Amino acid sequence: LLIGAIVVIAGLVFFMGGGDKSAKKSGSDSAEPIVIATHNWSSQVVMAHVIGGILESMGNNVKYVPADSQAVYESIRIGDVTLAHEVWESAFGKSFDTAREKGGVLDWGDHEARTIEDMGYPDWAAKYCPGLPDWNALKSPDCAKAFATPDSGGKGRMLEGPQSWHGDLIPQRIEALGLGDLWTVKFAGGADALWAELKAAEAEGRGTIIFNWTPNFTDGKGFTFIDFPPYYDGCRPVDGGDGKCGAPDGYLKKAVNENFPKTHPNAAEMYKKLSFNTSQIGAMAALVDEDKMTHEDAAKKWLADNKSVWEKWTK
């Protein structure tokens, strides 16, 4: 009887004292769901589910909500969304800064990957416009003609991303550089339309210039960004400049609601450590855009194949 009592007491001490450290760790986070926003490009949605999968492995509850890629930072600020994981400096930096300056949004660090977002072309299309990637090659009428489509009015067409991403930045640039008589800018409905255009142009034997970014699945396929005049602070029209400049490279940040470290301290600690590089992010996108997996299945596969990458962040 005495031995049995000792065993029971020892078991209680083990349980209450943290013998099961993983249970203790997950137990200190709130049961309220961590709300992760999803947008309209593959790496972002796959990464949302990758992060959600990591959080669920730690015992957290996760909820995914579609959100506008500009307005999401205000949603984080007021607590409707918990975190953002792909804050692209060029596209979303101003919206992020505006929300952060109001209070309620925390900068939760950068990914290892650096970003570029600009107009460019698949390497096989260079033959249609000798002189690329120098932007001056776009001044050639023959070049523009080789990039014309039925909806471009005889001009060369550039296919931008959704207008919600950058507003009229690219049309303003084309006009500022004196290319408006030869080129027109159209807006894609989403990232899928950009990738469909790549396939269509190759099949039809014409050139194509699209908006693209890195990190992305196209990193391994051969894609070149056009060398526009260098970016400098203040060169864009929104900042009072003439718009005659390309895009800078930039950060890829994480953002969280200010209460996240208080309500979910272990999750917040993991998320602070989390950092993906260019090849990892490109691989996530490729599972959807090339392998045609669903975002959810792509995330499950990435997590299963890369435990050595992410499990250390949960320790």
Q: Where on the chain are the PLM-derived regions?
A:
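A bilobed periplasmic-binding-protein/Venus flytrap-type ligand-binding module shared by bacterial periplasmic
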Residues: 117-128, 249-263, 286-287
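Short helix-initiation/N-cap motifs at beta->coil->alpha
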Residues: 39-42, 60-75, 185-197
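An extracytoplasmic/periplasmic, membrane-proximal ligand-sensing/linker region
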Residues: 32, 43, 165-184, 188-205, ...
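A conserved helix-loop-strand patch within extracytoplasmic ligand-binding domains
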Residues: 104-159
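Short, polar/charged alpha-helical segment
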Residues: 42-61, 173-174
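Pocket-flanking alpha-helical
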Residues: 48, 67-103, 193, 217-222
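Short, well-ordered beta-strand elements
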Residues: 29-43, 60-65, 155-159, 271
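Ligand-binding pocket segment of bilobal, Venus flytrap-like solute-binding proteins
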Residues: 81-86, 157-232, 237
